[in-house]
């Protein structure tokens, strides 16, 4: 039914409704993007709606140098914003497809990898690091905020990849103490984090927030008693 409508009518309907979905009912309609005037970028639309098959089709068109891709779809800023959002939201397959499409994983000091670390998506972190992301970008932001948010597996992985647990006056262990992540505190201290940094900030914040197991661990560690 839909493919029997004249192309001119499709153009008018789609421009009026601003609905990308109308172009996704048939691969042949995709080329109508030449004639469309959308306010929203199609990559953004596809990512927000988790349309993996459409992304794969766009990659296919890119690989055969289809002119519609170069002229109408690829917007570097939008690619990077979509990559960051997908890393934050844990959408590994979309992250991979966006990288295949040309998204820059190093943009804004490796922001994509830092967001994946901060929000606890270990598989995305590992994937981005395998692609060359710098785990120490922005003064070890990734391990610091993974520590703050209690992502022990990510903290261990990042340290294994070279993150400095003493960066920014051992900020990682101070945040882990403040937010009550005992196992991360133990791990970081045993890896060399300075739990006495900034006049014992870690134990003070742990005490202030009633994380008494952390207080006990840090006090015992300072006297040579470990459990």
UniProtKB/Swiss-Prot annotation:
Keywords: ANK repeat, Repeat
Superkingdom to which the source organism belongs: Viruses
ANK repeat copies, ranges: 38-66, 78-107, 108-137, 139-167, 168-197, 199-227
A Pfam family of this chain: Ank_2
InterPro entries to which the protein is assigned, alphabetical: Ankyrin_rpt, Ankyrin_rpt-contain_sf
Record carries keyword Membrane: no
UniProt-listed SUPFAM superfamilies: Ankyrin repeat (SSF48403)
PANTHER family: REPEAT PROTEIN, PUTATIVE-RELATED, SURFACE ANTIGEN BSPA-LIKE-RELATED
Name of the molecule in the record: Putative ankyrin repeat protein L45
